[in-house]
């Protein structure tokens, strides 16, 4: 409405437009555009189905060995892990895993933030990784299936200091719980492999509340009971670690962080 009104005014000559330059009309149009963008990105919050989360976690913990045994490691993931292992062993530095790194922007940012650490970004999508993003000498980008990668990490002698899981696919429909990491059969592998700290960010607070509940239940069942949850809390100044985080910040969509820390 505001944009079309501005177009109509432009046909009446510059004098009628002059009072609005940089003023209320432009500000209102910008505000409306921001509201539209926020409505596109925002996912409605809802109450966590505690019983459903607990039931799934109990099943996955009880059947985890069966899940691992019936699933062969993907060949490309085995090769990628070999590369990761050699890279990590060549450096005497704390190891950080950027799980689901997408185009590698977050891996680059983390490598710059932690120059004395080794940062390995892992994503399943060759298309995203093929963007050709350059990373510093302390970083590496690899294509691999995360479930298999975590399994190989757990079977290796590598020690992970911290894992970042930034803006994973939320699969927002209620029936999609099994597709979210907290409801997936690979959850025990993730918790075992994440190291001393797991940092998760999302624009959907419900996702993080659900993950916190799942991790707590897994801890009760003996899967990383040493991990203590902090959050989720809203980030006051998100730094744009990923393209999603940058989009959300521009659209005025709040983003949240959950930290699981070894204590």
Question: Can you say where each PLM-predicted feature lies in the sequence?
Answer:
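Class I S-adenosyl-L-methionine
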Residues: 209-214, 218-263
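Conserved SAM-binding loop
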Residues: 132
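Conserved SAM/SAH-binding beta-strand->alpha-helix loop
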Residues: 125
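Class I SAM-dependent methyltransferase "Motif I" SAM/SAH-binding loop
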Residues: 100-104
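Conserved SAM-binding strand-loop segment of SAM-dependent methyltransferases
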Residues: 138-146
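N-terminal mitochondrial targeting presequence
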Residues: 1-33
């Amino acid at each position: 409405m505001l944009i079309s009104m501005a177009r109509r005014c432009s046909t009446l000559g510059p004098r009628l437009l002059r009072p609005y330059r940089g003023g209320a009309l432009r500000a209102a149009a910008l505000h409306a555009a921001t509201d539209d963008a926020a409505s596109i990105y925002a996912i409605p919050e809802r109450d966590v189905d505690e019983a459903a989360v607990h039931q799934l976690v109990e099943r996955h913990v009880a059947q985890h060995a069966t899940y691992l045994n019936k699933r062969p490691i993907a060949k490309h993931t085995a090769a990628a892990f070999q590369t990761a292992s050699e890279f990590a062993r060549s450096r005497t530095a704390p190891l950080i895993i950027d799980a689901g790194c997408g185009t590698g922007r977050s891996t680059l940012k983390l490598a710059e933030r932690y120059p004395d650490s080794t940062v390995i970004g892992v994503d399943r999508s060759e298309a995203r990784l093929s963007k050709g993003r350059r990373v510093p000498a302390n970083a590496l980008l690899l294509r691999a299936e995360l479930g298999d990668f975590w399994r190989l990490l757990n079977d290796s002698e590598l020690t992970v200091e911290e894992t970042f899981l930034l803006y994973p696919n939320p699969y927002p429909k209620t029936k999609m719980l099994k597709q979210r990491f907290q409801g997936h059969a690979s959850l025990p592998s993730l918790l075992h492999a994440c190291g001393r700290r797991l940092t998760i960010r999302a624009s959907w607070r419900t996702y993080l509340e659900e993950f916190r509940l799942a991790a707590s239940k897994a801890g009760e069942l003996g899967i990383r009971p040493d991990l203590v949850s902090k959050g989720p809390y809203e980030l006051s100044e998100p730094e744009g670690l990923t393209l999603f985080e940058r989009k959300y910040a521009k659209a005025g969509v709040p983003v949240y962080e959950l930290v699981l820390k070894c204590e």
